[in-house]
Amino acid sequence: VLAGTIENLRVQTQNRLFSDLNQQGTLWWRPLQHLSKTVDISQKAQSLHFDAESRERYFTVCLKNSTRLRKLIQWAQADKNKQRQMRILVIDDEADQAGINTCNIDAEEVSRINKLIRALVNGKNEDGKDIESTYLAMNYVGYTATPYANILNEPPEKGSLYPRSFITTLAVSKEY
């Protein structure tokens, strides 16, 4: 989960997810914190079980800042064999905050954080270059109540987080 720019809110989101995901069921969700190439051995990809038969699942809540995103990408790509086993769902909480491309689109510039999110989602290294290994699956879901910046700042182009058909309007619930 990509969650904002404030650490105490990141921790709050992680704790809420841990509590909500670990209800009754056969899966156990384990939080991984501040992932990087130098993380504790128990959180390195080589120590984790990504096979479909494993009852253990993993999640991390990462701040949308360039250092954390760069380290997350490096962690995910540190072990090529494990990377090929990873099924990743990136959930961009408040996708209109910090992650949108705020650079001049006519100059084909990309903001640093948007470039790193694109690299993660599109299977590139932290410099945006192709890598030798790919993930088993990669999906990106960005949600926000106000998607105007996402629509207007980033036209659908190669590598964009938002293809032409990225918006889905949800039906109004009966409780509304």
Each model region followed by its residue ranges:
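Conserved P-loop NTPase catalytic core
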Residues: M86-D92, N101-Y176
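Conserved nucleotide-binding/hydrolysis micro-motifs of P-loop NTPases
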Residues: I6-L9, S66-R68, D96-Q97, T146-N150, ...
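Conserved RecA-like helicase motor-core motifs
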Residues: N22-S42
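A short acidic (Asp/Glu
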Residues: L9-F18, L69-Q74, A98-N104, N150-P155
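Amphipathic alpha-helical scaffolding segments
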Residues: N15-L21, Q77-A78, R87-V90, S160-P163
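Short His-Asn-centered micro-motif
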Residues: L2-G4, V61-K64, D92, Y143-T144
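Conserved RecA-like ASCE ATPase "motif II neighborhood" in helicase/translocase motors
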Residues: K37-I91, G99-I131
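Conserved Walker A/P-loop ATP-binding site and its immediately adjacent core
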Residues: V1-W28, A145
